[in-house]
A protein has these predicted regions:
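Beta-strand/loop substructures that line and gate deep hydrophobic ligand-binding cavities in soluble
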Residues: 76-135, 142-144, 226-262
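Mature, function-bearing regions of proteins
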Residues: 209-217, 230
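Hydrophobic ligand-binding cavity/cleft-lining segments
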Residues: 1-44, 143-210
């Protein structure tokens, strides 16, 4: 077993009271610190308090200690061990030090996974969380944003959420009205992290086709041809984006053409939706720009 201890700290040009007030909003609806939507938000099953359970993404933990305005410790859920903690330390001159510590006992396999895959992403997520503290707390704002390493970018791309198959949503009224009797329909869905756009117009770049109809939460794209017509619906509902495709063939040539295309269609739909999802997440403003900072 190896003891992994990972420490990040930064001096913030703001009082510990200001930074502590930001810390107390972690995991709330107006959380100004979680580096979402590029990273999964920190979510708990209740208010920030000892005993609250939650995590970010697939990392699960519970609040084992909480000193309001001063620090939080999260213990990893079994079978994992160890903890990670975020603390504010007062300094002279109306400044403070923010420190994040992760400590865990790891076997060889876990250590290799941590070293090669998880650590670059962990380092980046923590530094971006501290970036948000500096953005929100310091009168001069963020001096120098953290720069991602190549490995962190690669690993984040690899583990980015993948679309899941779903039925055509009932709320996708434009898709349902597109054709009276479509010959094909499918739908792929991704969750929307806090900070991602909820306006369907922001998602029109998923497919480079003509806008056929719009609704408050749905955008319908499509093209018509002599052999087939197709429509693609982008629906925003229940904190998810859903890409629905419906196709109507007109003749034998259309049926033969789509018999070939449908083999590649699921892959291309997932690829384009996932690519747009990632692009819009990186383009979103940071949390302090979306919430009212406590000063």
């Amino acid at each position: 077993m190896r003891t992994v201890r990972n420490v990040h700290e930064r001096i913030i040009q703001a009082s510990p009271e200001v930074v502590g007030a930001l810390l107390d909003r972690l995991s709330s609806q107006d959380d100004p610190l979680s580096p979402s939507p590029v990273w999964p938000p920190i979510l708990l099953d209740g208010p920030l308090a000892v005993g609250a359970n939650g995590g970010h993404g697939f990392i699960r933990y519970s609040v084992s200690a909480y000193d309001p305005g001063r620090g939080i410790r999260f213990d990893f859920a079994p079978p994992s061990n160890g903890f990670h903690a975020l603390a504010v330390e007062p300094l002279e001159g109306d400044r403070c030090r923010v420190r994040h510590v992760l400590e865990q006992e790891q076997g060889l396999r876990s250590w290799l996974l941590w070293t090669l895959v998880i650590c670059p992403m962990h380092d980046t997520m923590v530094e971006e969380l501290i970036d948000n503290i500096e953005r929100a707390a310091s009168p001069s704002g963020l001096r120098r944003p953290y720069r991602w390493s190549r490995r962190a970018r690669l690993m984040r791309r690899v583990i980015w959420d993948r679309p899941t198959a779903t039925g055509v949503p009932r709320e996708a009224e434009l898709a349902h009205r597109a054709f009276a009797a479509p010959d094909f329909a499918d739908a792929w869905q991704l969750p929307l992290n806090p900070g991602m756009p909820r306006d369907p117009e922001a998602w029109r770049g998923v497919l480079p086709y003509t806008v056929r109809a719009t609704a408050s939460n749905e955008l319908l794209l499509g093209e018509d041809a002599s052999h087939l017509d197709f429509r693609a619906s982008l629906l925003i509902a229940d904190d998810k984006v859903t890409l629905t495709t419906v196709v109507k063939t007109h003749n034998r040539r259309g049926r033969l053409y789509f018999a070939v295309v449908r083999r590649f269609h699921p892959f291309m739909s997932r690829l384009m939706l996932r690519r747009a999802h990632r692009r819009l997440a990186f383009a979103a403003p940071p949390a302090p720009a979306r919430t009212a900072p406590a000063r």
